[in-house]
Regions:
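Acetyl-CoA-dependent GNAT
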Residues: 3, 7, 12, 16-86, ...
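Generic detector of contiguous secondary-structure segments
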Residues: 13-19, 98, 115-117
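A generic secondary-structure micro-motif detector
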Residues: 40-41, 96, 119
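C-terminal "cap" of GNAT-fold acetyltransferases
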Residues: 52, 60-61, 116-139, 143-169
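Conserved glycine-rich acetyl-CoA-binding loop
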Residues: 68, 86, 90-104, 111-113, ...
């Protein structure tokens, strides 16, 4: 993604994260996931990430509103395909459609990169996430333990149409 995408629904703009956003992204993630700490009995993995490394090594896009970072999505390609590694929405923006918009952005990025599916995972006790992902077309395909985390893996087929390799004469 290049540049800024102004005029998004909800009055925010999307742009690539930069190194100078590290502290703001870390603070956003801490705020977005804080309510899960008691529920799952530990810090969710996104709260333990080093965001200077994440911003350097992955595609991180932030959503800004009035100059403040209120959302972020972390994307990467893995052996399984195009991964939405993290979606974080500031508590003040929950219920505004920002999370869904970040997921739609991620899906568009996957299509642009030539992928016909996108996958993600979430803790099994993050039931709001599971419900949202199911509502918008994600289907559970696996459950795995990763350390102390019981994770639900979900995938969404994007219905990409691949260009034909034949040419007309």
């Amino acid at each position: 993604m290049t540049g800024t995408a102004p005029h998004q629904p909800g009055g925010y703009s999307l742009r690539p994260a930069t190194r100078s956003d590290t502290a703001s992204v870390a603070a956003l993630v801490a705020a977005a996931y804080a309510h899960y700490v008691e529920r799952i009995g530990m810090l969710p993995r996104p709260m333990t990430d080093d965001y200077s490394t994440v911003i350097r090594d992955r595609q991180v896009t932030v959503a800004e509103h009035d100059g403040a970072i209120v959302g972020a999505v972390v994307l990467t390609v893995t052996d399984e395909g195009f991964l939405i590694d993290n979606v974080a929405v500031h508590p003040s923006r929950r219920g505004t459609g920002l999370g869904r918009a970040l997921l739609q952005f991620a899906e568009a990025e996957a299509r642009r990169a030539g992928f016909d599916a996108v996958h993600l995972y979430t803790h099994e006790r993050m039931t709001e996430n599971l419900a949202l992902y199911s509502r918008i077309g994600y289907v559970e395909y696996d459950r795995r333990w990763q350390g102390a985390f019981s994770l639900v893996y979900m995938r969404k087929q994007l219905g990409c149409v691949r260009p034909s390799s034949s040419t007309s004469n």
